[in-house]
Amino acid sequence: MKNTKQLNDALEHRILILDGAMGTMIQKYNLTEEDYHGEQFRDWAYPVKGNNDMLSITKPSVIDEIHRQYLEAGADIIETNTFSSTTIAMADYHMEDFVYQLNYESAKLARKACDDYTAKTPDKPRFVAGSIGPTNKTASLSPDVNDPGYRAITFDELRKAYKQQAEALLDGGADILLVETIFDTLNAKAALFAIDEIQEERGIRIPTMVSGTITDASGRTLSGQTAEAFLISVSHLDLLSIGFNCALGAKQLVPYLEAIAPQTHFRISAHPNAGLPNAFGQYDETPEQTAEQIKEYLDKGLINIIGGCCGTTPEHIKALSDLAKDYKPRKNT
């Protein structure tokens, strides 16, 4: 991986800024069903509005513009538009056969944007993180309360799907693979197993970020793990970072970051939501409010990589970038 040394050097010297939300940014464009179909899928027989990942193919200018807004705001790392780009998640749209193209084209878009900004300021290299979401199925829990032993997906089916996604992201130019929004650690382990297979087959080391989701005030993931248990579950791996994203706002994440910080030599990341959604599912937290809460992470030395999830905008990321400049990154234990 050609940019790994630059990435590690940057992490040694400063807190890196991850980008913010993709989905809520796309909503602002008010795209139509026709926009989603584009030219390639003009005659597609199924409705696809809401399948944001396909916009990397059908409306690349929209995705490129969002990437560049985040880079302009100060992001060091931008995520590919591939959160749902596995055969498992794409089955909802009957688009399993296009998964390689979705991931490859998304990574290429992000790569070009990053390279353009790195060329402007070579002392601040930008990096592409291939976004790998949890899929819409869980390997640990039954979807049927009347049949607790039933599973909608197997570990090997997940491994195969994740491997296809990861290979395409790497082929398209990703520097990092980000396994994120993990609600079921068994799903994540399938992704990490697939990444390890690729490392072995290609003879490379892939910087891998792992980011779990604490679903509510219970302090646990959906599959029942505490923050500490989640950390232990993946601590045998060689990870670039571990952390949390989504579900909660910045303030609510503090105790979980504090729980893992003394117990790991991994770098720590966080990309919380812009607070909690209101009654209409919208996020009201301003960039200033988010930054004020994130300041606690920095004051306590908890963080190496910081960004935003649902509801965050380039303005939120600029506020975080401006704030983080005055702080040193967390030192590994």
Regions found by a protein language model. Give the residues of each.
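Domain-level signal for soluble alpha/beta catalytic cores
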Residues: 1-333
